[in-house]
Amino acid sequence: MSWQLPGPAWLFCPADRPDRYEKAAAAADVVILDLEDGVAAADKTAARKALAETPLDPERTVVRVNAAGTDDLAADLTALAGTGYRRVMLPKCEAAEQVTALAEYEVIVLIESPLGALTVERAVQSPNAIGAMWGAEDLVAGLGGNSSRYADGGYREVARHVRSSTLLAAKAYGKFALDSVYLDIRDLDGLRTEALDAVAVGFEAKVAIHPSQLAVIRAAYTPPEAELAWARRVLDEVPKHRGVFAFEGRMVDAPVLRHAEQIVRRAARA
């Protein structure tokens, strides 16, 4: 994949609201123009027209198309053919063949069904798959449930399992991973906790549903000054040692050095 991710704060924008496009692009690192769940069935034709007539920077835009096997996907692709957009998000992805059928596009697979959770490893191996995201709400609905989270806001075990499986599959095959949305717009503390966890385990970005969430996500991906200073100090020590060494009371080996390198890279992208 040659695409360099523009940043960690991504934002969904309904494709039938072209009045919001520029504002979304000004606020987010990447805008996901949504032709699927964010648009009512009666408004999808208008959404495709708006998408074609109101262009954004293709390097900072992804289009969420409709699911494989739907008439809406065919109409989406017809509309996209006349645009500069060549990166799409495929919702409810359940098979590698659904990804390779979109060979003209770079595809982010969205894992949000029981079958998708079981086939994510094969889907991300598709040559045109560049990343993976997971979604909790459709997943739980597909299981016959009605809540992805406990009362305290934490994910139930099945959602955590799919989150981890999606992350592992993406990273095992050299693709990026996006953490799912946080639906409680007012709960910025909960979002912060979840975004910090996404950083800690290796998600490259977290997707927002409201512009007010973007600053929280960016802050989570920006290393604290003390952490960044430590990372730089420990990396400066490497030429002075052979193999494992002790630094500031901590054993430093190859994994610790990789952690330090990740911190410095995140700071450079912030």
Give a label for each model feature:
Residues 1-270:
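Expand to "…catalyze enediolate/carbanion chemistry for C-C bond making/breaking, isomerization
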